[in-house]
């Protein structure tokens, strides 16, 4: 598994170079773009059992068109099963093999961010979401609530309110009531929705001015 050790080194370098680079752009006025390619879970083969994982490893070893999606799917399974270091190494392999301008790259950042966030690595997750936005012309609908969640979780609460305000500006009838969160954010956990409800309460108490 030398390639996993190589991947771990690559990821360590990636995280080291971005650790101090968590400055987000100021929120834009509106975020209407669906950005479906980014927010779709990376799945090469349906399933999450040992047989599926073995087939995914075969795709990785063949290094064909689906190899990086297979790596990302394996990485998620590894991180969710307690093998975080191996999962990180697998993600690093996928990043190394994916061009900066590839549509897959933003999806890798988005998926890796969620895996990091759910392991309690909120600052790292925030930086991965930032990179999912970097250099792109879209203004994705996922960005305001997701960045609000990450910023609030890292203690950057004024910035979290700015991003939540962008969600409300974009879809005021959707984001002005946390009761809608289960419908709007079906893949979020209850704890994540509760955290966003804290952001909402703070925004409601003192909504930031625009611009």
For every predicted segment, state its role.
Residues 1-8:
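Bacterial N-terminal signal peptides that target proteins for export
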Residues 8-16:
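Bacterial N-terminal signal peptides
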